A protein has these predicted regions:
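N-terminal beta-loop-helix "entrance" segment that forms/cooperates
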Residues: 33-57, 222
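Buried hydrophobic positions in well-ordered alpha/beta secondary-structure cores of metabolic enzymes
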Residues: 11-14, 67, 131, 168, ...
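Short acidic loop-to-helix transition motifs that present clustered carboxylates
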Residues: 111, 213-220
Length: 345
C-alpha cells in the first residue's frame, strides 16, 4: 500500500535540505521496494507568500490525510515583527493534529566528539531520547498579567500525563529499558500527579526500570553524566529547557532530528535547527538532521526498522570517512554530503 508523505520545505535552507532528505528516501526505496508518494505543500513563510497564511487550508487538509509529514525549516527575517509570522504555522499545525509528544534523540557520533563543549570522556556512550509533553502545562494554561501581579496556570490532567509517560515506556521497551521521569515533586502539585501516574504506568512495563529525578538535578546530570540516561520523559516547560540543553551536547544542531506524535493521526518529523537564512541558496547547508528525520519517519510511522538503520549507518560511515559540511569542520556541499550518504546506504 502506497504511503502518503507530505513534504513541507518551508523557508531558508528548508528547500535544500528537504531535497536532500527526499533524494536519500528515493535511493533507499529503489533498494528496498518502499512504496510512497510525496505531496509538496507551502508552509511557513512560503505559505504566507502563497496563500496569506503560514498554514494554508489546503496544506492542513493534506496533512490530516497523510501517513506522515516531513518539515524542513521555517522562519524568515522578512516577517520579523509582522502580525502573521511563519512560526505561527507550526504552532497551528501542532494544535490541529494534536501533536502531544515531542521526541528528540541525542546521540554523539564518534567522529564529531571534538565538537562537543564537554570532555570526550563525559560524552562517551551518550545515546538517549528526550520525550516532552507538548500540548499541556503552563504554556497552555491561563496567563494573567495585572498592574503589580502576574500568574501563569500550570494545569495537567491524569489522561494527559498518562499518554506521554506511556509513550516514553513504549520507546524505552525497544532501547536500554530505563525511563527517567523528571519533575519537581517536592514543590509542585502537577509534579506530584506526574510521579503518581508514572508509578502507575510503570506497572504495565515490568521489564522497564523507572527512575525519578528532580528537574534541577537532572539539568546538572545532563552535563556531568549524560550517558546515564536512556529515555527521559517530562512536562512541557521542563522538556522545553532540557531538550535545548541536550542539543548542545553534540556541539552542532546540524545532526539532530526530532519527531512529534499524535494519538491517532500522522506524525511530524523535522530537524531541530532553524531556517538559517544567512546561508540559504548557497548549497552549503548540512542535510544530516533532515536525512535522520527521514530515518525516524521510516522507523516510527512505517515500522521499517532496517531501512532506518541503513540510513543512520550510512550517515555515520560518511562522517567517519571525513565527509563533513562547513558547520562541522569540513568543506562538503549539501549535494556532496547527500551523495556520500546515498553511496553508503
Amino acid at each position: 500500500m502506497t504511503k502518503k508523505i507530505v513534504a513541507l520545505a518551508g523557508d531558508g535552507i528548508g528547500p535544500e535540505i528537504m531535497e536532500a532528505g527526499l533524494e536519500v528516501l528515493e535511493a533507499l526505496a529503489k533498494k528496498t521496494g518502499f512504496d510512497y508518494e510525496i505531496d509538496r505543500r507551502p508552509f511557513g513563510g512560503a505559505g504566507i507568500d502563497a496563500a496569506g497564511h503560514p498554514l494554508p487550508d489546503e496544506t492542513l487538509k493534506v496533512c490530516r490525510e497523510a501517513d506522515a509529514i516531513l518539515l524542513a525549516a521555517i522562519g524568515s527575517p522578512q516577517y520579523d515583527g509582522a502580525a502573521v509570522r511563519p512560526e505561527q504555522g507550526l504552532l497551528a499545525l501542532r494544535k490541529e493534529l494534536n501533536l502531544y509528544a515531542n521526541i528528540r534523540p541525542v546521540k554523539i557520533f564518534d567522529s564529531l566528539k571534538h565538537l562537543s563543549p564537554l570532555k570526550p570522556e563525559r560524552i562517551a556512550g551518550v545515546d538517549f531520547v528526550v520525550v516532552r509533553e507538548l500540548t499541556g502545562g503552563i504554556y497552555f494554561g491561563d496567563h494573567i498579567l495585572e498592574e503589580r501581579k502576574a500568574r501563569d496556570i500550570n494545569d495537567y490532567s491524569y489522561e494527559e500525563v498518562e499518554r506521554i509517560i506511556r509513550k516514553a515506556f513504549e520507546i524505552a521497551s525497544n532501547r536500554r529499558k530505563i525511563v527517567t521521569s523528571i519533575d519537581k515533586q517536592n514543590v509542585l502539585a502537577t509534579s506530584k500527579l506526574w510521579r503518581k501516574v508514572a508509578e502507575k504506568v510503570s506497572q504495565d512495563f515490568p521489564d522497564v526500570t523507572l527512575e525519578h529525578q528532580l528537574v534541577d538535578s537532572a539539568a546538572m546530570l545532563m552535563i556531568t553524566n549524560p550517558a546515564k540516561f536512556d529515555v527521559i520523559v517530562t512536562e512541557n516547560l521542563f522538556g522545553d529547557i532540557l531538550s535545548d540543553e541536550s542539543s548542545v551536547l553534540s556541539g552542532t544542531l546540524g545532526v539532530m532530528p526530532s519527531a512529534s506524535h499524535s494519538e491517532n493521526g500522522p506524525s511530524l518529523y523535522e530537524p531541530i535547527h532553524g531556517s538559517a537564512p544567512d546561508i540559504a541558496g548557497q548549497g552549503i547547508a548540512n542535510p544530516i538532521s533532515m536525512i535522520l528525520s527521514v530515518a525516524m519517519m521510516l522507523r516510527d510511522s512505517f515500522g521499517r526498522y532496517e531501512d532506518a538503520e541503513r540510513i543512520e549507518l550510512a550517515v555515520e560511515a560518511s562522517l567517519a570517512a571525513g565527509i563533513l559540511t562547513r558547520d562541522i569542520g569540513g568543506q562538503a556541499s549539501t549535494k556532496e554530503m547527500t551523495e556520500a550518504i546515498i553511496a553508503r546506504l
